[in-house]
UniProtKB/Swiss-Prot annotation:
Belongs to the DEFL family. This is Defensin-like protein 58. Keywords: Antimicrobial, Disulfide bond, Fungicide, Plant defense, Secreted, Signal. It is found in: Secreted. It comes from Arabidopsis thaliana. One of its GO terms (cellular component) is extracellular region. It comes from the Eukaryota. GO terms for biological process: defense response to fungus; killing of cells of another organism. Disulfide bonds join C39-C73, C43-C66, C52-C71, C56-C72. Its main location: secreted. Residues 1-23 form the signal peptide. The keyword Ribosomal protein does not apply.
Amino acid sequence: MNITKRYVVIFFLVMLTKSLSNSDVLVSSVIETSKNDVCFIPCTRRYGDWECYDDCLGKNFNDGGCVDGRCCCKK
């Protein structure tokens, strides 16, 4: 019984540590994309800044580009 409790506690500690270690990455992504109105399609080698910009203009946005691997449009 004690071994099971220890494994459960260790498991939760690992999960907590793992979730906290990614928080800096997530925050920087949110801060960077908060300057944009909408972000959607993932950017790739074939779908880059120019394609993203063109799609944003087609959706009546004034500007657009790849931000953190996603196409983001600005009004």
